[in-house]
Amino acid sequence: MQRRQLLQSMGGLAASTMPFSLAFAQTSALKISHQFPGGTIKEGDFRDRLVRNFAAEVEKRSKGAMKFEIYPGSSLMKTNAQFSSMRKGALDMALIPLSYAGGEVPELNIGLMPGLVVSYEQAYSWKTKPVGIELTRVLQEKGIVLISWIWQAGGVASRGKPVVEPEDAKGMKIRGGSREMDMILKDAGAAVVSLPSNEIYAAMQTGAMDAAMTSSTSFISFRLEEVAKALTTGRTGAYWFMFEPLMMSKAIFDKLPKDQRDMLMTVGAEMEKFALEAAKKDDIDVAAVYQKAGAKVVDLSDGTIKKWQDIARKTAWKDYGAKNEGCAKLLALAQQTL
């Protein structure tokens, strides 16, 4: 009995003298949270698939030194608790629409700014341009490391008539997805409803909401064709582009050895091609899903996108730029990419 206790205490002593980062890396499975429906590497919502692919690839390259636990469907914590939990080091990683954290960090509302991004090419160009470098810096300052850049176009699903032109929104109760989207809807005469995308179905089903803006992927994953009679797609262009990156707590990231940090960043960047292709595919697939369900499907013209953009310039952009110096700087840098 004494020999066993001695061995146990020696084992504990050995562990306590290990470099902290090595002990951390070898004993902790990193938890990744997101709000989207769970699936497999091959099937389901591409955001869940991306997280699973990312985890599998890092585990493989690290020869099992890094392991992950994935929690889809807000099964680990509430959707809106994820960002602040990462900042505190209480959650390791999450894939979140960035604008959900805009109440906590005003600069992050740029992640869903109406009409500021109008194409995938422009969206992904942010990463290497001054706006992306500044956004990455802001996030790091707030305790977050950006691992994968993920952008998605979106549209509007409606229980009644399609919402295409600004005047179509008048008198309707609509979910925009961000404070800034809500501002252009209010300007167009709509009443706004604020909730995460995983709560849209119930609100539309009960009639608490007439229409919702969200990504093409969420229109499919949350089966909104069951409660919608019309869909305005983003397949020909959109004024609704959502930045939904895979992020990591800087407190956790900084504890890892350099080779593991580098591996996370490398694999994260490699996932971006998959994200772009999957998002574009969903922009096309969503139209077929809704047509099959009997919904009226319409697209946006360049002229209509410009109308919404003009409203955004005088409302959402102006409001965002006036918030603080950081917002003004990001807005100016983003406009350089238009």
From Swiss-Prot:
Principal localisation: periplasm
Keyword line: Periplasm, Signal, Transport
Signal peptide per UniProt: 1-25
GO process annotations (BP): C4-dicarboxylate transport; transmembrane transport
Gene Ontology cellular component annotations, sorted alphabetically: periplasmic space
Location of the protein in the cell: Periplasm
Zinc among keywords: no
SS bonds (residue pairs): none
Residues bound to malonate: 47, 100, 175, 197, 214-218, 244
Pfam family, one: DctP
NCBIfam families given in the database record: TRAP_S1
Oligomeric form and interacting partners: The complex is comprised of an extracytoplasmic solute-binding protein and a heteromeric permease formed by two transmembrane proteins.
Family the UniProt entry places it in: Belongs to the bacterial solute-binding protein 7 family.
Function statement: Solute-binding protein that binds malonate (in vitro). Probably part of a tripartite ATP-independent periplasmic (TRAP) transport system that mediates solute transport into the cytoplasm.
Protein name: Solute-binding protein Rfer_1840
Annotated organism of origin: Albidiferax ferrireducens (strain ATCC BAA-621 / DSM 15236 / T118) (Rhodoferax ferrireducens)
